[in-house]
Amino acid sequence: MLEKEDIRSLLKELPSSPGVYRFYSIEKELIYVGKAKSLRKRVANYFTNKKNLDQKTRSMVRKIYHAEYTLVNSEYEALLLENNLIKENKPKYNVLLRDDKTYPFICLSSADFPTLTTTRKIDKKKGEYFGPYTSGRAMHSLVESLRKTFFIRTCDLNLTKQNIDAHKFKVCLEYHIGNCKGPCEGKQEKEDYDVSIIQVRNILKGNFSSVKKYYQEKMLSAAEDMQFEKAQFFKERYNSVLGLEKSSLIVNPDINNLEVYTIVKRLNRASVNFMSILHGSIIKARTIEMKAVLDETEEELLMHALFEIHEEGWDSTKEIICNIELPILSTYCKVSIPQRGDKKKLIDLSLKNAWHTLTRYDDQKKEKPEIRVLKTLQADLSLKELPAHIECFDNSNIQGTNPVAAMVCYKNGKPSKKDYRHFNIKTVEGPNDFASMYEIVYRRYKRMGEEGLPFPTLIIIDGGKGQLSFACQALKDLNIYGQIPIVSIAKNLEELFFPGDNDPLYLDKKSESLKLIQQIRDETHRFAITFHRQKRSKDALLKTEFENLVGIGPGTVKKLLTHFKTVKRIKEASIEQLTPVIGNSKATILFQQLNK
């Protein structure tokens, strides 16, 4: 789910303009498309009024990892673009969240003599589906028109060749009033029926020209024959088809198989907007931000963007319109810069989105460098949350002597020294880094759990797969494994290991993510080494000061140091001050020997 900081940034950049927003999961899957009269207000509802959301919507919001949007000129255009994008991409949650209802489809059945029906449930075994349709009235009108225009049967009889030859069926009223040619009695051949089905399929795919032409001819013919009632009927059917055609468009229906590209540039930054038009509908929209490294021209930058979008070549592209000259593409397809008309309106709409993305950068560049690096780290490690709270662990010992460990904490990309912790290893004998790592991780998060403190959003282990495995076991024994992302960084090769994955991740040596991890690892190592040296020095001092004292063993020395903290304070203590710590007898012996 998006972090609070990301949500605030998103809502801040969203304009109060009509548009279409798109939500993506962490797997970069498009999960929801929505429309809005005001993008800022609509998107804010998902994150600021969670109590008013139903269970399905809350589930969707938890999976939002990234958001994009496209500006349009009106709320109506937002509705149409939303519908086109849903049809093209079929996002998971659009089926679940559409006002608690599923939009209807037209089904062309797979029977020998196919039928046309409407349905809200899809079963691909039963036929071919077209839709969804936002206007049920227009959809039913189209089905009725197609049935009557092409004499499509309305019955559900099993019209196999065997049944027809056996004369099992009789024609119904639809045949007698001229709406059906009677295939049930063999009065219409299957080949003739299939021709009609081909025409119906083409229309359902967006080719309305044939049916419009048919209605126009029928309307004129009826008018010439003075059959005005019949002419009015065909006029109504013609208008209903026009209405349905209009509801599926955001641009001129005559514009087909067209791609729109615009580029805007400011200093060394550029923004490229792309739109794909099919049968008059915008079915794809994308904006790419670019940076000119070697002072590339607008044409060079745009070509880079085009080749990224067209990874598989240019075979399907018939025409491109753009706001700059692209002579290099003229051999592949038609390229033009429209100056007027509907294509010019498309260019203007594309430029609107390109400029919006470019000017948005002015706000983004004000973002703190630490947060930017954390976002990069989040993306590189595929983390669900921004790693705003990172804790890193390291062991330190010399041949098993004075084993200690350290944990450093980074919050919002900076050291939080008040949260640093060091550990004396208590349960491990000898040099065993794996067992020591288990102990300190277990102790750290057991205590945090008992005190109700928030867990970090990322744990880093200084070591390889062995240390990582023991750290993970500690989390498992605490029943919190899986709640906190954890990785280890191995020395020398700077390999990053993840639980359950034998293959390491190698980040670019120059990447900000790796530099941050190295900085945290090195700081942990420094803190551990410093503590280890202090402990060795203290132990050496104690040995020098107390090793020749009679009747004072290591256990007594440890009690004294725990209470008085320093050797100097122990030496300055009176018998009365020593007695509560080690007893009167030892206090007297110690005091007498220290004050000879």
UniProtKB/Swiss-Prot annotation:
Q: Name one GO biological process term.
A: SOS response
Domain of life of the native organism:
Bacteria
Q: GIY-YIG domain: from which residue to which, for each copy?
A: 16-95
Membrane-crossing ranges are: none
Q: Which SMART domains match?
A: GIYc
**SUPFAM superfamilies xrefs:** C-terminal UvrC-binding domain of UvrB (SSF46600), GIY-YIG endonuclease (SSF82771), RuvA domain 2-like (SSF47781)
HAMAP family hit by this protein: UvrC
Instruction: Tell me the subunit arrangement.
Output: Interacts with UvrB in an incision complex.
Name of the featured protein: UvrABC system protein C
Which species is this record about? Answer: Cytophaga hutchinsonii (strain ATCC 33406 / DSM 1761 / CIP 103989 / NBRC 15051 / NCIMB 9469 / D465)
Q: What is the lineage of its organism?
A: Bacteria, Pseudomonadati, Bacteroidota, Cytophagia, Cytophagales
